[in-house]
Regions:
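Ubiquitin-like/PB1-type beta-grasp interaction modules and other compact soluble beta-rich domains
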Residues: 1-90
Length: 91
């Protein structure tokens, strides 16, 4: 991400993450210091009690950048869409 440049992204929430946050998606302007998925989660938690509750256990919330599953340490780069969702199970 360019230094001192804000980054506009769409954040989408799924399943119980969406229920706790209270919306399906939102477009936000990220501060320039938000560089990784983990940074973003920390920033979101400061936005209000609903976010703090949704990300209270960040190790179980999964993320995807532009529809690709990633780890918390992944850099956001030029990402346009970020999705948060609970672990996927199935058989």
């Amino acid at each position: 991400m360019a230094e001192n440049a804000a980054h506009r992204v769409r954040i989408r929430y799924f399943a119980w993450v969406r229920e706790k946050v209270g919306c399906e998606s939102e477009d936000v302007e990220l501060p320039a210091n938000i560089e990784t998925v983990a940074d973003l989660v920390g920033w979101l938690k400061q936005r209000g009690p609903q976010y703090d509750e949704a990300f209270a256990r960040p190790q179980i919330v999964r993320a995807a950048l532009d529809k690709v599953h990633v780890k918390p340490t992944t850099a956001l780069g030029a990402t346009r869409e970020i999705a948060f969702f609970p672990p996927v199970t199935g058989g």
